[in-house]
């Protein structure tokens, strides 16, 4: 068997973190384990060493396994560019754009791709921990599903369903999810996990017993709410406006550095700012109103899957004028990827938006033109005198650069990347702030521009260690709060035979049996 699908009752139920925790727990036992998500819909992505693009959650899960990310861990990635269209990335590379309806026509071929990719991983590893997408009970999508029960059926995977108790109604979520599945799908569901519980778990005992009596399936653990888990959010639902990112430690000096990040409608790789939030004395907030910039020291304009449309949103909300005024007062602004493109004088886009040429914010003397081919690479260079690396995922490229514009990054051959003009900086590089020495120099520069002389950048923050600590915490939570013996049984033997089948999904008016054997 050696593989397990972790599904969830909803988006943001905790599938990604539970999968990462199970990966970490298994890896710490010495097992060769790999992550897998057949289809991910996310604008949070990374570039792999093999030159492709996958969802960030699978890169984090790979790190939990002690592996470099690979396109095989996420063979299909959907990157929404609007409410109706998404870019399709197959095995790391762009494979056209689709609408929800046109995508259905590709599902059969893609199912073959994801199953064969999973088969290869299963042959090479002791265990493969698969993550579902959204909910397996989206009955309008089941006929062409390749990410949840469609994958489980095709690959013979036992399924563990995660429910988020913090939303309320977790027992209805779990029971209803199971009951909506058809009989063959229900037979693969071996149990449940309750996630994000606050308080004394003994309060749940009667509910757990009743759920087992109703479904014939146990809850294999109750994971507590963990305030210290905040890195590498998979879902855009996690980027709440006005909420502080992470759990910032007190400043090393006498002043905080306050960072505002416009929460763009099509924000991508918002996790770039998490490295800033890991620093003592740095308070990072996502914002949607210009008034929220009035007390900010630094504005970070993040990436976007729809640069021109999100630039229009900045104008519509008044944030564009507020960002210009912020920089006009000598206060620091930095743009990353799409945010960097917005800071330039002109953007010509016949690829993402098709609108042609539009004016940027005019804060960096550059012009950007979008190309059909997507740039995917993991470059290195120097910035603020420190060695740096990062990764690039973009269609827009500079086609004109002002003679006097300095680069933020200097490439090995001496070429300038990005831009730096007064208190305004920009780069196409994601992951730049994960370089510890550069991040400290950048924060010191930003504090100087903002007149925050009392802010002192910590000299001992290692973002890699912070991330590793988060993964170890996930592994600890799984080991302490889940029935790991039961998870091993699912991995090795699949879902038990004879599990009850519930109406209406299984038909009939009473619980049926999935086959011989006892409950």
UniProtKB/Swiss-Prot annotation:
Any Pfam family the entry gives: GATase_3
Domain (GATase cobBQ-type): give its ranges: 256-438
InterPro entries the UniProt entry points to: Class_I_gatase-like, CobQ/CobB/MinD/ParA_Nub-bd_dom, CobQ_GATase1, CobQ_N, CobQ_synth, GATase_3, P-loop_NTPase
Query: Could you give a single Gene Ontology term from the biological process aspect?
Result: cobalamin biosynthetic process
Question: In which pathway does this enzyme or protein participate?
Answer: Cofactor biosynthesis; adenosylcobalamin biosynthesis
Kindly give the SUPFAM superfamilies that the UniProt entry links to this protein.
Class I glutamine amidotransferase-like, P-loop containing nucleoside triphosphate hydrolases
Q: Name one GO molecular function term.
A: ABC-type vitamin B12 transporter activity
Q: Which CDD domains match?
A: CobQ_N, GATase1_CobQ
Enumerate the UniProt keywords alphabetically: Cobalamin biosynthesis, Glutamine amidotransferase
**Residue ranges the record marks as coiled coil:** none
Q: Where is the active site?
A: 337 (nucleophile), 430
State the protein's purpose: Catalyzes amidations at positions B, D, E, and G on adenosylcobyrinic A,C-diamide. NH(2) groups are provided by glutamine, and one molecule of ATP is hydrogenolyzed for each amidation.
The record's similarity note reads: Belongs to the CobB/CobQ family. CobQ subfamily.
What protein is this chain from? Answer: Cobyric acid synthase
Naturally occurring in which organism (per UniProt) = Saccharopolyspora erythraea (strain ATCC 11635 / DSM 40517 / JCM 4748 / NBRC 13426 / NCIMB 8594 / NRRL 2338)
């Amino acid at each position: 068997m050696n593989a397990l699908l972790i599904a969830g009752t909803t988006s943001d139920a905790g599938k990604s973190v539970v999968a990462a925790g199970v990966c970490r727990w298994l890896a710490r036992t010495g097992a060769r384990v790999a992550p897998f998500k057949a289809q991910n819909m996310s604008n949070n992505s990374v570039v792999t060493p093999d030159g492709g693009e996958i969802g960030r959650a699978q890169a984090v899960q790979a790190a939990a396994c002690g592996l470099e990310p690979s396109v095989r861990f996420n063979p299909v990635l959907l990157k929404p560019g609007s409410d109706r269209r998404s870019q399709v990335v197959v095995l790391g590379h762009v494979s056209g754009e689709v609408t929800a309806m046109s995508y259905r026509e590709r599902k059969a071929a893609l199912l073959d791709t994801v199953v064969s990719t999973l088969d290869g991983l299963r042959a090479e590893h002791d265990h493969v921990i698969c993550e579902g997408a959204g909910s397996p009970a989206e009955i309008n999508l089941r006929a062409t599903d390749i990410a949840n029960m469609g994958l489980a059926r095709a690959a013979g995977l036992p399924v563990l369903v995660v429910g988020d108790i913090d939303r309320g109604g977790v027992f209805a979520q779990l029971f209803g999810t199971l009951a909506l599945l058809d009989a063959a799908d229900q037979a693969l569901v071996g149990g449940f996990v309750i996630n994000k519980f606050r308080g004394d778990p003994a309060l749940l005992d009667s509910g757990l017993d009743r759920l087992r009596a109703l479904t014939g399936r146990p809850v294999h653990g109750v994971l507590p709410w963990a305030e210290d888990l905040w890195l590498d959010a998979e879902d855009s639902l996690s980027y709440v406006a006005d909420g502080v990112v992470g759990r910032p430690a007190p400043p090393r000096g006498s002043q905080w550095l306050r960072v505002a990040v416009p929460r763009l409608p099509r924000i991508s790789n918002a996790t770039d700012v998490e490295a800033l939030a890991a620093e003592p004395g740095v308070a990072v907030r996502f914002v949607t109103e210009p008034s929220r910039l009035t007390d900010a020291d630094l504005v970070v304009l993040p990436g976007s899957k729809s640069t021109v449309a999100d630039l229009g949103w900045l104008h519509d909300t008044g944030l564009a004028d507020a960002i210009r005024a912020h920089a006009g007062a000598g206060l620091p602004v930095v743009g990353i990827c799409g945010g960097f493109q917005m800071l330039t004088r002109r953007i010509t886009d016949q690829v993402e938006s098709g609108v042609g040429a539009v004016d940027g914010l005019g804060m960096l003397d550059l012009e950007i033109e979008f190309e059909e081919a997507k740039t995917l690479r993991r470059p290195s260079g120097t910035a603020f005198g420190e060695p740096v690396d990062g990764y690039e995922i973009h269609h827009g490229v500079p086609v004109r650069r002002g003679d006097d514009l300095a680069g933020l990054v200097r490439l090995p051959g001496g070429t300038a990347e990005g831009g730096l003009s007064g208190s305004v900086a920009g780069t196409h590089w994601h992951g730049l702030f994960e370089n510890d020495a550069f991040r400290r120099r950048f924060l010191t520069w930003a504090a100087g521009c903002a007149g925050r002389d009392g802010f002192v950048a910590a000299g001992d923050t290692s973002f890699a260690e912070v991330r590793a600590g988060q993964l170890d915490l996930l592994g600890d939570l799984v080991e302490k709060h889940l029935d790991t013996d039961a998870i091993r049984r699912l991995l090795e033997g699949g879902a038990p035979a004879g599990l009850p089948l519930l109406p209406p999904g299984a038909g009939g008016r009473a619980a049926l049996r999935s086959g011989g054997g006892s409950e």
